[in-house]
A protein has these predicted regions:
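Membrane-embedded beta-barrel scaffold of Gram-negative outer-membrane proteins
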Residues: 441-442, 451-467, 628-632, 637-643, ...
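Face-selective signature of the C-terminal outer-membrane beta-barrel domain
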Residues: 391-405, 431-597, 603, 612, ...
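Short, acidic, small-residue-rich periplasmic hinge/interaction motif at the N-terminus
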Residues: 3, 30-32, 36, 87-128, ...
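Extracytoplasmic beta-strand/coil segments of soluble accessory domains associated
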Residues: 87-89, 136, 140-177, 207-208
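Short acidic/polar hinge/loop motifs at secondary-structure boundaries
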Residues: 178-207
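C-terminal beta-signal and adjacent terminal beta-strands/loops
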Residues: 181, 646, 706-707, 711, ...
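Gram-negative outer-membrane beta-barrel transporters
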Residues: 549-556, 563-565, 688-709, 714, ...
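Transmembrane beta-barrel wall of Gram-negative outer-membrane proteins
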Residues: 261, 267-408, 501, 561
Length: 895
């Protein structure tokens, strides 16, 4: 799957560690590195006599470390059964021997700063260092990337530069898609993908449209995760390995019993000081309490309840690699921080002759008090991974994998958090996601025209959502939850050819296919009238991507993608005698008159000779162009990029059910993203010290998405009978800047990153239910309202490596701005149910320390939210505060 820089995947395959080896003779540096890496190394000291090395600073795998130390020396290492041996490079020359240190083996972190596009990479160490409480916390600090509804689910809903949901930002796990759409009441929907962070080996993030088999429909970008493999587990020089990892964290406790109330309670209108006591009784009696006292029994900082444990084993038997892993995770209900916009009770008294009328309310970011247990933030999950890779003769290999994720978690409808007087702990929701992949690769060493990759994958997700409190009434409590089943199948084929003619050329071409099916686990007739969805969708895509390097300093890229899709709703579309329009004008009004659907053709109930179903077919062709220029060949690169992508209507958007439905006479069109970007990359060494590394990335982007698909109100002339309608609106525009600065001198390192949005606009032209054609804060009842990113967000990380790199200590500061505010008057979103969730600006401090006793044993300690801030995450659908100060202790052992 080619959705990132060439070579990044190979560089990401092996685990890395931090090293701080000072300058010395080449023999001593090699010996020191081998000792710290825990591998055997043999060489003839006389062969290296007189050669020096500037040492090794930073994070490297064993192969990368040897490559960096020996780069330009005319020597290389050869892997043998009992370790490594130094030998002369076959093509070494005298001039090469005179230069000791030059650019070494590419690391995935370095590829970010060589790519003529906005990309990011999260290594295994990054994921471990900033694990957080929720899965989405691993993306905190990544420029341009946020996670929607991070505290009210067990899944990932990634937002890249304002694009989110419905496969705008697909999350790929070993190349497979598993995204599902979950009903969130009047507040809309949430797209979710599920994976355990202990089983992730690395994450590559591409921002904006990309070519390749993995980029179909990705108008926002692609998040490509790879699961752990044998190289992550097996130490160098061995043919088997076992990794055991365990961690425990505080600031949490067992979930309370279902029905337990939380947050500010008993608000409303009451009577006091009544001349007639009975008037102050019943529903008008002044409440004795406004909170659940047991919810404030917060554990001490080092009093753990939550835990995560995993074990992974790998075996290498000649040409066969096998991996098996199991992970178990328990997250209790966490406690909110104490410092910030916590709620405070408000009292308004109106005195009358015989009584006082008292109105009790609250002011604050959410209903939860500072330091309170946040109900429904609990989860329990377990995951299993089986993986095998077989290296065949003639440079071929086959890889099979199976991943299963099961979670039981608490959550609440955002509408309950917003509107009801009491919020309560509910019974757990459940999800089981299974992913199977099979991949084949042929890369013959004697042919540069063939690098063939093909694969098939299948995902199966079963979910049960139990997220209604008893405030909604006994009838809802007794109703069985609807069990939803979601299945996806995909296949892809691609080949890369390289040749030389007026420069270097790389041609990548191929195609992909996927089919999706959604349905309810109910009998056939009953399922047709349930609120869930039932339908199928399939999509085919062909692409070609050409890269030409006419001179060392120039690189040109051009690509083209064609795709077509069909979505079909299994539910009947209209009832008897429904009138449908025969012709619709450009403004959405009916111009051709209406005809009545004959009774014998369709009906929601009873027999039907010719039922009417919603069926949408779409297609499109989109180009990508880019050019990069490295004028002085010193690591400074300038680039410009124009990238387009089509996203065909999703299965959710093409079918009837809860939240919204398409209309028979309102055709859905594909979204069309047109993104332009100019930027600069810098990757150099020896800036302030002989062995330091400086990397920087700067980008300005202008993203324009035409025919944006979202939920709206029906127009007044549309006799749809629907409360909410799925349709294309005019456009969404997002513009801004993004910057990253990364400096590593070995003993000290720092990383700064930030994103600034200077223009956000969503337009609906021609609709009857609007005040303004365009706004910067949202549209009435649109899902986009809670996908608008903050005006800015940034992070600063500073760390040091001590005791020869064994101790790594540091801190990260996260700064989050506000989103665009809704106006006090003439608010377009006030008439809808999806009113933008406003969060306050906040600053967080996280600290971490890691000590590696040996290559086989390490200990990590983190404190997240050191200053115990009370805050609401951006892009929240419901008012759920984030965790307060949380300590975490982890241990990793490798055998």
């Amino acid at each position: 799957m080619d959705v990132r820089a060439q070579g990044m995947a190979a560089a990401a395959a092996a685990p890395s560690h931090s090293y701080a080896i000072p300058a010395d003779s080449l023999s001593n540096v090699l010996a020191e590195f081998a000792a710290r890496a825990g591998v055997a190394l043999s060489f003839d000291p006389a062969m290296l006599d007189g050669l020096r090395s500037s040492g090794l600073q930073g994070e490297f795998s064993v192969a990368q470390g040897f490559g960096r130390i020996l780069a330009g020396t005319g020597f290389e290492v050869e892997r043998r059964a009992n370790g490594y041996a130094v030998k002369r490079s076959p093509q070494a020359s005298v001039s090469e021997l005179e230069t000791v240190i030059v650019q070494g083996e590419h690391r995935p972190q370095d590829e970010v700063y060589r790519t003529a596009a906005s990309v990011s990479y999260l290594s295994r160490d990054d994921i471990e260092r900033f694990r957080g409480t929720s899965i989405g916390d691993i993306f905190q600090g990544t420029p341009g990337v946020l996670v929607g509804e991070n505290r009210n689910s067990g899944g990932l809903d990634v937002n890249i530069r304002g694009m989110q949901g419905q496969s705008r930002v697909p999350v790929l796990v070993d190349g497979a898609r598993q995204e599902t759409t979950v009903y969130r009441g009047y507040s809309g929907v949430s797209s979710r993908s599920y994976v355990d962070p202990d089983l992730i080996g690395g994450i590559e993030i591409s921002k904006g449209p990309v070519n390749g088999v993995g980029g179909v429909g990705a108008t926002g970008g692609v998040v490509a995760m790879r699961t752990i493999n044998a190289d992550d587990i097996i130490r160098d020089g061995k043919d088997w390995g076992i990794r055991v990892r365990g961690s425990t964290s505080g600031n949490s406790s067992a979930a309370p019993a279902p029905g337990t109330a939380g947050g500010v309670q008993n608000t409303g209108k009451f009577h006091d000081n009544c001349a007639v006591p009975s008037v102050c009784g019943g529903q008008f009696a002044m409440p004795d309490s406004h909170r659940t006292e047991s919810a404030f029994d917060r554990p001490a900082l080092l009093d753990p309840y939550s835990y995560a444990a995993s074990i992974a084993g790998a075996w290498r038997i000649e040409s066969l690699d096998l991996v098996a892993a199991y992970s178990k995770r328990r997250q209790g209900t966490y406690y909110a921080g104490k410092h910030g916009p916590t709620p405070e009770l408000t009292y308004a008294k109106e005195s009358e002759p015989f009584l006082d009328k008292v109105t009790i309310g609250y002011q604050g970011a959410t209903r939860f008090y500072g330091g309170e247990q946040v109900i429904n933030s609990n989860s329990n999950s377990d995951s299993q991974l089986l993986k095998g890779k077989l290296r065949l003769p003639a440079d071929q290999q086959v890889e099979l994998s199976y991943l299963r994720y099961h979670s039981e978690y608490g959550e609440l409808m955002p509408s309950q958090l917003l509107w009801f007087d009491k919020i309560r702990q509910t019974s757990n929701s459940e999800v089981t996601a299974q992913t199977a992949t099979a991949r084949y690769e042929w890369d013959p060493a004697d042919s540069s025209l063939i690098h063939l990759k093909t694969g098939v994958w299948y995902t199966h997700t079963d979910s049960v959502n139990r997220n209604y409190s008893d405030e909604l009434g006994q009838a809802v409590q007794e109703k069985d939850p609807e069990k939803e089943r979601y299945k996806r199948f995909g296949a892809d084929l691609s080949n890369e050819s390289q040749f030389t003619f007026l420069g270097e050329h790389r041609l990548n071409y191929g195609g992909s296919y996927q089919r999706e099916d959604i349905g309810l686990v109910k009998p056939g007739v009953e399922a047709l009238y349930a609120s869930g969805r039932s339908g199928y969708r399939h999509e085919t895509s062909l692409f070609v991507d050409w890269n030409w390097q006419p001179a060392p300093e120039w690189n040109l890229n051009a690509g083209l993608r064609y795709q077509r899709a069909r979505g079909h709703d299994n539910k009947r579309m209209v009832a008897r005698h429904t009138e449908i329009c025969t012709s619709v004008g450009a403004d959405g009004r009916c111009e051709g008159g209406k005809v009545s659907v004959p009774p014998e053709q369709c009906g929601w109930t009873g027999p039907c000779d010719h039922p009417q179903y919603y069926d949408v077919r779409t297609s499109g062709t989109s180009p990508i162009f880019s050019v990069s220029w490295e004028p002085w060949m010193n690591g400074l690169q300038f680039y410009a990029r124009h990238a387009e992508a089509y996203r065909m209507p999703s299965l959710f958007e093409s079918t009837r059910g809860w939240s919204a439905a398409p209309l028979q006479d309102v055709a859905l069109k594909p979204e069309h993203a047109i993104n332009r970007e100019v930027g600069m990359n810098l990757l150099t060494e020896g800036v302030l010290a002989s062995n330091d590394r400086l990397a920087a990335k700067l980008a300005y982007f202008r993203n324009h998405t035409k025919n944006y698909l979202t939920r709206t109100f029906p127009n007044t002339w549309e006799d749809s009978g629907e409360d909410f309608v799925m349709r294309n609106v005019e456009s969404v525009k997002v513009r801004g800047m993004e910057a990253t600065l990364d400096y590593d001198a070995g003993w000290v390192y720092t990383r700064l990153s930030g994103t600034r949005y200077n223009f956000v606009e969503v337009c609906q032209i021609g609709g009857s239910n609007r005040i303004h054609e365009c706004t910067d804060y949202g549209l009435a009842t649109s899902y986009f309202n809670d996908m608008i990113p903050p005006k800015w967000h940034a992070s600063l990380q500073l760390g040091t490596r001590l005791f020869e790199g064994k101790l790594d200590v540091g801190a990260r500061v996260t700064l989050m701005g506000k989103r665009n505010q809704v106006p006090r008057f003439n608010n377009d979103t006030a008439r809808g149910f999806v009113q933008p969730v406003q969060w306050h600006a906040y600053q967080l401090v996280d600290v971490y320390a890691s000590y590696r006793f040996s290559d086989a044993f390490s200990v990590d300690f983190n404190i997240d939210n050191l200053t115990d801030q009370y805050y609401l995450d951006p892009l929240s659908l419901g008012l759920v505060p984030a965790p307060g100060r949380t300590a975490r202790l982890g241990v990793t052992m490798n055998f």
